[in-house]
Design a protein with these regions (language model features):
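Conserved N-terminal structural module of periplasmic/extracytoplasmic solute-binding proteins
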Residues: 4-10, 16, 31-102, 161, ...
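Extracytoplasmic/periplasmic substrate-recognition and gating elements
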Residues: 33, 62-66, 157, 231-238, ...
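Short helix-initiation/N-cap motifs at beta->coil->alpha
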Residues: 70-79, 98, 166-172, 240-254, ...
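A structural signal for short loop-to-beta-strand junctions that line the ligand-binding cleft
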Residues: 83, 90-91, 118-153, 185-187, ...
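Hinge/lid segment of periplasmic solute-binding proteins
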Residues: 96-146, 172, 277, 281-283, ...
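Periplasmic solute-binding protein
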Residues: 101-108, 125-161, 190-211, 296-304, ...
Length: 418
């Protein structure tokens, strides 16, 4: 498999390298059908290359199939929409759940009914990609949020680790104890964005949409969640990532300045590489005022280009990428939770390692409490903008909760009326 960035720079050299690699890898193959894949940039090209080399490559090679991975750097969704519109999209591509309705509405995604067996996959994940009775994507994996914590900081503070019995109140007390260790130590890292905060709004009993598709940001439950979230930042028990030179809560955790981050299984590989000596644990999100935890489901599916000239081979690659063997490998690498229902009781979850325990928590978190998919209907990710702007304003001290949410509600109403 070859990863090719979308850039004109170095194109001749890159093509020569690609050709040499493919000839070397498939020298014994009389013919090879090349399947182009579009996915995320960042770490994903290396992950897919390893998956091919270590798990599914021999099988595909025997069938005369080669792969070219084309990472869409930057704004993946915008780049994919452009490629679909221009007719240059790959044979196979990621469909993030948060933008699935818009991607499918282009008419460029092949319905998979009768082409791929969806029965082995978790029902809720199949439903997330089902529109008008047609299945347009097979979830490659999924994630929910967990409380991932630095054991050493809690030990130093002489306070119990976060656990599944924590309420917002007991959880906050533990964060305060850790933050009391030093001026540059904080109990938690709070992302000023819906992709993490949303779990707390759900724990308060808030729902993103009512029966009419309206979003109420002045709902007392939502207001309560914002006030709780902001209060911990304002008193110094929590910190924003940017305030300690980080871009996300996983980066905060790796600094040894923060006791807790709210992340999915994607953080495990990062910690293994960036903080190999970190002694960490994981537990469930704290119970909110509703008496339930809150959480969100994050998933990405593989979709097939309806205009692909290599439809059968693309479907075969999709099946290989979502096979039990491939998903077992993804699980053991600490990257995500498998979407196949049969892997829910995988022995890996019970091996007792920190990675295994974190994966178990993330898996079980998907069905524990008030859980909503990280999806926003046809509005797409723009739905988060009013909420994110309000959180930034409140958590940075630029606006009161009331003023920020009133403004956010006006923006949300305008957005939903388009």
């Amino acid at each position: 498999l070859t990863a090719i960035p979308h850039s004109e720079e170095g194109e001749t050299v890159r093509k020569a390298i690609v050709t040499a690699l493919l000839l070397a890898l498939f020298a014994g193959t009389a013919w090879a059908q090349n399947i182009r894949i579009m996915g995320y940039g960042g770490n994903d090209p290396a992950i897919v290359v390893r998956l091919l080399e270590e798990v599914i490559g021999d099988e595909l090679e025997a069938e005369g199939i080669t792969l070219t991975y084309e990472p869409l750097e930057g704004d993946y969704n915008a780049a994919l929409f452009n490629a679909l519109s221009a007719g240059t999209a790959a044979d196979l591509f990621y469909i993030p759940v948060e933008t699935a309705p818009g991607i499918i509405a282009t008419g460029k995604v092949l319905p998979l009914n009768g082409l791929v067996d969806v029965d082995p996959f978790i029902d809720s994940l199949v439903e997330a990609y089902t529109f008008d009775g047609q299945v347009y994507g097979i979830a490659k994996d999924f994630n929910s949020l967990a409380v991932v914590y630095n054991k050493d900081l809690f030990d130093e503070a002489g306070v119990a680790y976060p656990d599944e019995n924590d309420t917002w109140e007991t959880f906050a007390d533990k964060l305060r104890a850790v933050s009391a260790l030093d001026d540059d130590v904080y109990g938690a890292c709070f992302q000023p964005a819906y992709d993490r905060f949303g779990a707390f709004a759900l724990a308060a009993g808030w729902q993103p949409f009512d029966a009419d598709g309206h979003t109420d940001l002045l709902d007392p439950a939502f207001v309560e969640a914002v006030e709780w979230y902001a209060s911990l930042v304002q008193e110094g028990a929590a910190v924003l990532p940017a305030d300690i030179g980080q871009g996300w809560t996983g980066g905060c955790l790796a600094t040894d300045q923060v006791g807790v981050a709210f992340e999915g299984a994607w953080v495990l590989g990062f910690l293994r590489d960036e903080a190999p000596n970190l002694q960490y644990g994981a537990t469930f999100m704290p119970v909110g005022p509703s008496g339930q935890r809150g959480n969100m489901l994050y998933t990405v599916a593989w979709g097939v280009n309806a205009d692909s000239p290599n439809r059968d081979a693309a479907i075969r690659v999709l099946e290989a990428l979502t096979s039990p063997e491939a998903q077992q490998w993804v699980l053991e690498q600490g990257l995500a939770i498998p979407s196949r229902e049969a892997l829910a009781d995988n022995p890996f979850f019970d091996t007792g390692t920190p990675d295994a325990e974190a994966n178990r928590v993330v898996f079980q978190g998907a069905s524990d409490g008030n859980v909503a998919p990280f999806a926003f209907g046809t509005v797409g990710t723009a739905w988060m903008n009013p909420i994110n702007d309000a959180l930034v304003a409140v958590l940075s001290g630029q606006a009161s909760v009331g003023d920020a949410l009133a403004n956010a509600q006006r923006e949300m109403d305008t957005l939903l009326q388009r």
